A protein has these predicted regions:
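C-terminal catalytic histidine-bearing segment of alpha/beta-hydrolase fold enzymes
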Residues: 317-361
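Mobile cap/lid helix-loop segments that gate and shape the active-site cleft of serine hydrolases
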Residues: 182, 186-190, 197, 204, ...
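Alpha/beta-hydrolase fold nucleophile elbow
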Residues: 214-226
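Glycine-rich nucleophile elbow surrounding the catalytic serine of serine-hydrolase chemistry
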Residues: 224-234
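N-terminal targeting or regulatory segments adjacent to alpha/beta-hydrolase or S9 domains
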Residues: 1-73, 81, 116, 359-361
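Cap/lid segment of the alpha/beta-hydrolase catalytic domain
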Residues: 98, 106-200, 210-211, 256-259
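Short beta-strand/loop motif that positions the catalytic acidic residue
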Residues: 291, 298-300
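Glycine-rich active-site/cofactor-binding loop and its immediate structural neighborhood
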Residues: 66-126
Length: 361
């Protein structure tokens, strides 16, 4: 039988990849001034994300619940994330006098939609099944430690918001894996993408956090694991409101991710991390390099089956060359851990040390 598709891939996928020359990458692009390149690269990134929600006219922050914790207070809040969306979130505020450094926490995907922000901040006054769901997830991927609470105990204001389709921003009828492709298709039909929408929400979340009177807007960072890691380095590229970013278990190249055997070829969840047209100009490490010379951290696992080590190493080399070109090698941290797709406590401690170095006075 004749065919031109095998698995989920066209048989000519290699030729398609060969035509991607990433002409806007630093060093390939015509710009020789790095700041001029950054402006053009970021503008192109924004063009690929058009038809985004307007910024909110006012945040309209309300605190709806509070819980005292050891060294900090957990607050359940609602605020206007954009002109279209009023969202619930968790905000952790350390005891003492601010202004404090602050971190936007970006949750993972995991094809697990019942919780979002609760994957990173311990929920409170919730149904027992939500508490159990969160505890089990944190045990499975975060070494039984809520990363947000860990950072708050160490003096950081922490904000965690659900991405669209997760937690309290979910689907009325209940979310499932297959819903993603239809939701993503509908975004595409309206000239934008689900991924772009998530990124703009993250930008607005950061701007909101930086606006709070007890936050030092010069010391705002972002952190995520898995899809949250992708969101984190994208956020570092998209906005100067982020002063430092850390990304755990999401960095690679199109060469190694677009293969017949890599998880990304399944579609579905991949739509949440897709900005159409962007690959014609920039590969993943090129986009991440828009953040240079800001302090930026990447951790990956040698045993992580989702991200081939050769692709991680290629991406690291690319970014290292960019930071080095700007005399900022000391501001880029790249490390492959002897670990699976997992954010262990030692890694969390290393991320805290990174933020302490760059975001604390």
């Amino acid at each position: 039988t004749a065919y031109e598709v095998t698995g989920n891939m066209p048989v000519f996928y290699r030729q398609m990849k060969q035509q991607l020359t990433f002409p806007l990458a630093w060093g390939t692009a015509e710009e020789t001034d790095f700041d001029a390149w950054k402006v053009r690269a970021r503008n192109r990134l924004m063009e690929c994300m058009e038809n985004i929600p307007p910024a909110p006219e006012a945040y309209g922050l309300e605190v709806t619940d509070r819980e005292r914790r050891e060294g900090y207070e957990a607050r359940k809040i609602v605020f206007n994330l954009s002109g279209w969306c009023r969202v619930p979130a968790y905000l952790l505020v350390p005891d003492g006098q601010g202004p404090f450094p602050a971190i936007v926490l970006l949750h993972d995907h995991g094809a697990h939609f019942s919780i979002g922000k609760e994957k990173m901040v311990r929920p409170f006054h919730v149904a027992p099944e939500i508490m159990k769901d969160a505890d089990q997830w944190v045990d499975r991927y975060y070494d039984d430690q809520y990363t947000g609470d860990y950072l708050a105990r160490h003096g950081y204001v922490v904000l965690a918001v659900d991405a669209l389709l997760w937690g309290e921003r979910g689907r009325k009828e209940g979310a499932s894996y297959d819903v993603q492709q239809a939701l993503a298709s509908n975004f595409l039909q309206m000239g934008t993408s689900w991924g772009a929408f998530i990124h703009m929400d993250d930008v607005r979340s950061t701007e909101f956090l930086a606006s709070l009177p007890f936050v030092d807007k010069e010391r705002v960072g972002c952190l995520g694991f898995s899809m949250g890691a992708y969101r984190s380095w994208m956020l570092g590229a998209l906005t100067d409101a982020v002063r430092a970013s850390a990304s755990v278990c999401w960095m690679n190249t199109t060469e190694y991710l677009m293969t017949p055997t890599n998880n990304q070829n399944k579609g579905g969840s991949a739509y949440a991390m897709l900005v159409p047209g962007l690959r014609r100009y920039l590969d993943y490490p090129h986009v991440a390099s828009i953040a240079c010379p800001k302090p930026t951290l990447f951790f990956n696992g040698r045993k992580d089956k989702l991200f081939p080590v050769a692709g991680v190493e290629d991406a690291y080399r690319e970014m290292e060359s960019v930071w080095k070109s700007q005399g900022a090698s000391d501001r880029l941290v790249t490390r492959l851990w002897d670990e699976t797709h997992f954010f262990n406590r030692e890694m969390q401690q290393a991320v805290l040390a990174f933020f302490d170095r760059w975001l604390k006075p």
